[in-house]
């Protein structure tokens, strides 16, 4: 079951007078989800205990965001996300040396688990207009739009003991001792908060290229040359090793009103090295430190076709004559 409530612009005045206030730009949304399921035989369905036998829970998501203009040219978007989960069971795990296996101790009741994160995005647009070197006599103009952006996002480490969502035990098997970390709420209808402190700085720059010209009837036409050409990379300030992400490139071409070609490519930031066992593994030195751009590690392409009313008419006429 899903309960969704969109409460955008909750602070806007119904009868505004004068300029818009800063707090009127704040948007608040709420989404609630309830899950309740069980796997059993038909004749045993109503004999099961709602708390012990059913898989159930509830999740609340509340994003709060706003968009402001800074110095007339910069768009600033702060966002705070809050998620809360309600569980009906808590599972504590341990290692039983005699049985040589993991054992569970389940506590039933109401268990509230939450997590939160915050982010801040800043972007602007730079416009350029120029005439191509070829066909100078024709009225052709190229518009280039560059959109640089930077964003900051942060979240605490929810595996920390101060939150009480995670625990660990010592696994002693075949003379090998390992520390196993786990969440009390893993495997339930809603996933628990993920681990690891986050402090991400993301950089992105996108380009759009459009040509404007006059046709034979002196009508102005616009043609998309490059719908989007972008590159992005991020830096995790909380990472102890290898804080840089891979460098990604994306290209989208609108071949017509209905056809779109998309391509993407990824370049690994860190160079390979040999570990103590002679295996090739990603190292801690960047490709840049060796004077290389990056290590190509993947490529993808997709082709999409958008069907509109005109397209449906053409298809129908093709089959019906």
Predicted regions and their residues:
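Outer-membrane beta-barrel proteins and related beta-barrel translocases across Gram-negative bacteria
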Residues: 5-321
């Amino acid at each position: 079951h899903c309960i969704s409530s969109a409460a955008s612009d909750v602070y806007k005045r119904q009868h505004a007078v004068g300029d818009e206030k800063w707090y009127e730009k704040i948007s608040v949304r709420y989404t609630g989800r309830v899950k309740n399921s069980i796997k059993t035989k038909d004749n045993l369905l109503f004999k099961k205990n709602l708390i012990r036998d059913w898989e159930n829970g509830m999740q609340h998501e509340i994003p709060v965001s706003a968009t402001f203009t800074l110095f007339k040219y910069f768009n600033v978007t702060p966002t705070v996300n809050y998620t809360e989960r309600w569980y009906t069971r808590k599972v504590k795990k341990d290692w039983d040396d005699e049985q040589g296996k993991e054992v569970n101790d389940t506590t039933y009741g109401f268990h509230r688990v939450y997590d939160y994160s915050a982010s801040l995005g800043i972007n602007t647009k730079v416009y350029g207009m120029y005439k191509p070197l070829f066909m100078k006599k024709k009225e052709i103009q190229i518009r280039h739009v560059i959109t640089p952006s930077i964003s900051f996002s942060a979240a605490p480490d929810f595996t920390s003991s101060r939150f009480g969502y995670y625990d660990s035990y010592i696994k002693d098997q075949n003379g090998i001792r390992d520390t196993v970390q786990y969440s009390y709420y893993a495997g339930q209808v809603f996933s628990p908060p993920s681990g690891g402190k986050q402090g991400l700085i993301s950089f992105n720059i996108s380009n759009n290229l459009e040509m404007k010209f006059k046709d034979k009837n002196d009508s102005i036409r616009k043609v998309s040359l490059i719908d989007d050409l972008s590159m992005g990379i991020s830096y995790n300030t909380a990472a102890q090793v290898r804080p840089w992400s891979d460098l990604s490139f994306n290209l989208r071409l609108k071949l017509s009103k209905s056809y779109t070609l998309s391509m993407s490519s990824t370049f690994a930031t860190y160079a390979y090295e040999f570990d103590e066992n002679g295996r090739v593994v990603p190292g801690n030195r960047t490709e840049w430190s060796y004077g290389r751009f990056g290590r190509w590690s993947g490529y993808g392409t997709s082709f999409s076709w958008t069907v509109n009313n005109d397209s449906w008419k053409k298809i129908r006429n093709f089959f019906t004559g």
